[in-house]
UniProtKB/Swiss-Prot annotation:
This is Guanine nucleotide-binding protein subunit gamma 4. It comes from Oryza sativa subsp. japonica (Rice). Expressed in the inflorescence meristem and intercalary meristem. Expressed in the bract primordia of primary and secondary rachis branches. Residues 24-107 form the G protein gamma domain. GO terms for biological process: floral organ structural organization; G protein-coupled receptor signaling pathway; regulation of seed development. The gene is DEP1. SMART domains: G_gamma. Keywords: Cell membrane, Membrane, Nucleus. The lineage of its organism: Eukaryota, Viridiplantae, Streptophyta, Embryophyta, Tracheophyta. Involved in tolerance to cadmium and copper ions. Seedlings overexpressing DEP1 exhibit enhanced tolerance to cadmium. PANTHER family: GUANINE NUCLEOTIDE-BINDING PROTEIN SUBUNIT GAMMA 3 (PTHR32378:SF10). The keyword Cell membrane applies. It comes from the Eukaryota.
Length: 426
């Protein structure tokens, strides 16, 4: 009863014991350090190889092989050393464009690597030339010969015989142009212009049309393919009319005697041109009864180009131009190039003889320098000037607006008033 109760202490957590490196953190850190050293070594080798000459690259590879084979890295395992050195050779060979099988044969790092095909052939020297020889196509295939090695033509132009071998950048000097400047293989950049025989072959390759001349020579048989209007062929009686294919294809000039009358094919198909007196106007068109009996008084516009009504020209020979026959559907009669005083066609609506805007009844007609705006009789119907008359009607300038404040424009020689070309704005 008198014994005292024993008080037990609460258990305290103990620190965990030191376990070994189960996660392998220290081992991974060691591998990272090894890889960093290897990367630094590769960077130094690359920096050295970039500055090396192409001739000394093979010697550099041999030195690297000896260095890697003799001085081993103590941190790299022995089993992985050969594999990584061979992988280093493969990477360097890809950068330097070197046959990998040749390197494998030299270093003997892989037992499966065989002697490459480029060392077995007898023409291994052709791979070093800029253009592969035709007999080296078997041994120079693959990485030893570039695909576009045949882009350069030989001086004897033997490869220019086939179009597939002669590329567009052919720069052969071709002493014998018969083999180089062929139609199927000669290129524009081929320098074959110094030999006379080359011009013949080039002329046969690139034929120039006979009408690439300043004037067409009608004595040649291919004259009618020319489209120059200044061509006048043999047998053409009308000097103003070109032969078929050389100017006016719609005009047949065979036996045309009268220039004022249209020949066969030029407007009057049923009217003969011999004398131009035996043909009546009714033969040209039935509704041309109002024309005179002379065939030449009825214009070729009676053939239907004027449309509804017949063009009535009382006397065709009073027109100064030789052919007053070009009519259009827009105009009733168009005397192209004729003077209105000589040509008696009733051009009362619209006419080509008045070279202004008066005959078109536009509001700007009174600003033009024509006889219509000067109060003289013209081809227009009525009086076209609705604005005031010019201050100097006797002057030939035809000025409408004149003001003393105007400083630009022309001055009349008599009154010396300045002309406001765009209207008086005062």
């Amino acid at each position: 009863m008198g014994e005292e109760a024993v008080v037990m202490e609460a258990p305290r957590p103990k620190s965990p014991p030191r376990y070994p490196d189960l996660c392998g953190r220290r081992r991974m850190q060691l591998e990272v350090q090894i890889l960093s050293r290897e990367i630094t070594f590769l960077k130094d080798e690359l920096h050295f190889l970039e500055g090396a000459q192409p001739v000394s690259r093979s010697g550099c590879i041999k030195e690297i092989n000896e260095f890697v084979g003799t001085k081993h890295d103590p941190l790299i395992p022995t089993k992985r050393r050969r594999h990584r050195s061979c992988r280093l050779f493969r990477w360097i060979g890809s950068k330097l464009c070197i046959c990998i099988s040749c390197l494998c044969y030299c270093c003997k790092c892989s037992p499966k690597c065989k002697r490459p095909r480029c060392l077995n052939c007898s023409c291994s020297s052709c791979c070093d030339e800029p253009c592969c020889k035709p007999n080296c196509s078997a041994c120079c295939a693959g990485s030893c010969c570039s695909p576009d090695c045949c882009s350069c033509c030989k001086p004897n132009c033997s490869c220019c015989k086939t179009p597939s071998c002669c590329k567009p950048n052919c720069s052969c000097s071709c002493p014998s142009c018969s083999s180089c400047c062929d139609t199927s293989c000669c290129k524009p950049s081929c320098t074959c212009f110094n030999i006379f025989s080359c011009f013949k072959s080039l002329y046969s390759c690139f034929k120039i049309p006979s009408c690439f001349k300043s004037q067409c020579n009608c004595s040649s048989p291919n004259c009618c393919t020319c489209t120059l209007p200044s061509c006048s062929c043999k047998g053409c009686a009308c000097p103003s009319c070109g032969c078929n294919g050389c100017g006016c294809p719609s005009c047949g000039c065979n036996g045309c005697g009268c220039p004022s009358c249209g020949c066969n094919g030029c407007g009057l198909p049923s009217c003969g041109c011999n004398g131009c007196g035996s043909c009546s106007c009714a033969q040209c068109k039935p509704d041309c009864g109002s024309c005179s009996t002379n065939c030449c008084s009825c214009k070729p516009s009676c053939n239907g180009c004027c449309g509804e009504q017949c063009c009535r020209c009382a006397d065709c020979f009073s027109c100064s131009c030789p052919r007053c026959s070009s009519c259009f559907n827009i105009f009733k009669c168009s005397c192209a190039g004729c003077c209105s005083s000589l040509c008696k066609c009733p051009c009362t609506t619209q006419c080509f003889s008045c070279q202004s805007s008066c005959c078109k009844r536009q509001p700007s007609c009174c600003k033009c320098q024509s006889s219509c705006c000067e109060g003289q009789p013209s081809c227009c119907e009525g009086h076209c000037c609705s604005l005031p008359k010019p201050s100097c009607p006797e002057c030939s300038c035809g000025c409408v607006w004149s003001c003393k404040n105007c400083t630009e424009g022309c001055r009349c020689p008599r009154c010396r008033n300045p002309c406001c070309l765009s209207g008086c704005l005062c």
